[in-house]
Amino acid sequence: MSKMTKKMKKICEIKSSLKDYKFNNLISILNSFPKAKFNENIDVAINLRINTKKSDQNIRGSIILPNSIKKEKYIVVFASGEDKKNAYEAGANLAGMEEVSDKIKNNKKLKIDHVISTPEAMPIVEKLGSILGPKGLMPNPKLGTITKDIKNEIKKIKSGQLNYKNDKYGIIHTTIGKINFNNLELKINLLYFLNHLVKTKPTNLKGVFIKKVSLSTTMGGSVIINHNEFLQENNISDNIKK
């Protein structure tokens, strides 16, 4: 069995000394963990009570949080003619048709954050399924990434739009803030996301939808919050059973 690092020991000591993981304590708790030398993300993991083997219970979508987490994104657009021109004007890093496909095939280490496609270009994109699919980069109409409104989609991405989907265990992982956010900024973002998420609850799913919510920093430990109390205090219903 491997030895616990000094950093992990410190995190465990802090967590074991705490008895109250209410939201208002979270920023101070996360800030008390050993820090990295950069402005770490604050990530959320949300365990959902869904059956991932049923296609109608899988959750995916996109959202722009009130307090944006903007960062530079490498955006690839599959389009031609005027749509290609619009893509570059809106800030795409790479746009085109077959030439873009060839570049991706020949440089599999290319760090791409988002791929957008016009409907007409999808036959080219589909041939890249084995490369883009495992990275979660395939354009999808539910996410708005198959569109003729290229400029608007790029604008949303650059404004901090987050894409999310559950993994095979029914857990959604995404970022809701930075370690330099204050308590109110983080609270607003988490509330906004949870309220949005509750509205995506499958119609055939009865009872509790959200099972567990935990927050963590990029390099630190995670803390489970009392999400039922948090939701109720802010008048968000998850059909919580008493």
Swiss-Prot record:
Keyword annotations: Repressor, Ribonucleoprotein, Ribosomal protein, RNA-binding, rRNA-binding, Translation regulation, tRNA-binding
GO CC terms in record: cytosolic large ribosomal subunit
Gene Ontology molecular function terms on file: rRNA binding; structural constituent of ribosome; tRNA binding
Domain of life, source organism: Bacteria
Signal peptide positions on this chain: none
GO BP: regulation of translation; translation
Family annotation (Pfam families): Ribosomal_L1
InterPro entries according to UniProt: Ribosom_uL1_bac-type, Ribosomal_uL1, Ribosomal_uL1-like, Ribosomal_uL1/biogenesis, Ribosomal_uL1_3-a/b-sand, Ribosomal_uL1_CS
Repressor keyword on record: yes
Subunit structure comment from the entry: Part of the 50S ribosomal subunit.
Family: Belongs to the universal ribosomal protein uL1 family.
Function: Binds directly to 23S rRNA. The L1 stalk is quite mobile in the ribosome, and is involved in E site tRNA release. Protein L1 is also a translational repressor protein, it controls the translation of the L11 operon by binding to its mRNA.
Record protein name field: Large ribosomal subunit protein uL1
